[in-house]
Regions:
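C-terminal structural segment of proteins
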Residues: 1-301
């Protein structure tokens, strides 16, 4: 059955949003909602938050506070452009956006939408979790509350967001210049991640890694920090032995399951391969057995 066409409201003043959201549903890029509506989901009234994007920059940097503020209602393309145009440095998030879906989807999808769907496979969330993000939420009375991202994520399709609330921005401590993101999916574009990894660290003059933070998606009910593996790497040179120990420690941080996209066994093997590649990028001198990320043909084994 085709859902009834919704009434669309598009405020341009943040002060109007809370009033309009009474009995309505917030929408930004709508990339997830469109899929839900094809499955019959009703949404009689939608409040389009993208009208708020013109009132502020996509990314702002507060050097005094050492903090980046990222809009939750701008398209991902605008966020990536803001990060590469000098508004801030966030290599892991920039890389995640570059690998997110397709150009068309990136021109519509938003950080806010990617957060509130509560998907453990969401591609922007590992970078934000690794960076220690805080979520700014507007309450129905127009007030503001802030929640750590780790506490915002409650489970598959569940987040700490009450009726009438909406996400306005995400704030992160200024990330280091060294960071990245890798994902494994069924193809290079328009693919949900079988699993993904974001990382960031400082590299000291002697080569030791400090401030190591890792986060992985699709290996637990929510995106999770790899705290045990990060502790192994902290203040260490990423030698072969240290990397082997960090890779072995991943099992303590993840709890993947078998599902339609991949088996738990496949995900554990890919998790090890992704972290190894982040720490020791493949080179022409690598041993033949050093990189063991399995092929997608093995995903159901």
């Amino acid at each position: 059955m085709t859902p009834t066409a919704p009434t669309l409201l598009r405020p341009t003043d943040p002060a109007d949003v809370s009033r309009l959201l009474a009995g309505a549903r917030a929408v930004a890029g709508g990339t997830d909602l469109l899929v839900q509506r094809r499955a019959g989901a009703e949404a009689p009234t939608l409040v389009d938050l993208t009208g708020l994007a013109g009132a502020r920059p996509a990314v702002t940097s507060d050097d005094a506070a050492g903090e980046l503020t990222i809009s939750a209602v701008h398209p991902l393309t605008d966020i990536a452009n803001g990060l590469t145009d000098g508004a801030g440095v966030f290599p892991a998030l920039t890389a995640a956006i570059c690998q997110f879906a397709s150009t068309t989807i990136r021109n519509r999808a938003t950080i806010g939408g990617n957060l509130v769907t509560g998907s453990p496979a969401a591609d922007t969330v590992p970078a934000l979790l690794a960076a220690g993000a805080a979520i700014d939420i507007v309450t129905p009375d127009g007030g503001l509350r802030t929640v750590d991202l780790a506490e915002f994520l409650l489970g598959p399709r569940r987040v700490d967001l009450a009726a009438g609330e909406w996400v306005t921005s995400v704030r992160v401590p200024q990330p280091p210049v060294e960071g990245g993101f890798r994902k494994i999916g069924g193809r290079r574009a328009q693919a949900i991640s079988f699993l993904n990894l974001a990382w960031q660290w400082h590299r000291e003059p002697d080569g030791r890694l400090t401030g190591v933070r890792l986060a992985m998606g699709s290996v637990a009910p929510t995106v999770v920090r790899l705290r045990t593996a990060a502790a192994v790497l902290e203040a260490q040179l990423p030698t072969q032995d240290v990397v082997d120990a960090a890779v072995a420690a991943i099992d303590a941080d993840i709890s993947p399951i078998d599902d339609l996209r991949a088996s738990a066994h496949y995900r554990r093997r890919c998790a090890a391969g992704l972290l190894r590649e982040a720490l020791l990028p493949p080179s022409g001198t690598a041993r033949a057995d050093q990189y063991v990320t399995p092929t997608t043909r093995e995903k159901n084994q």
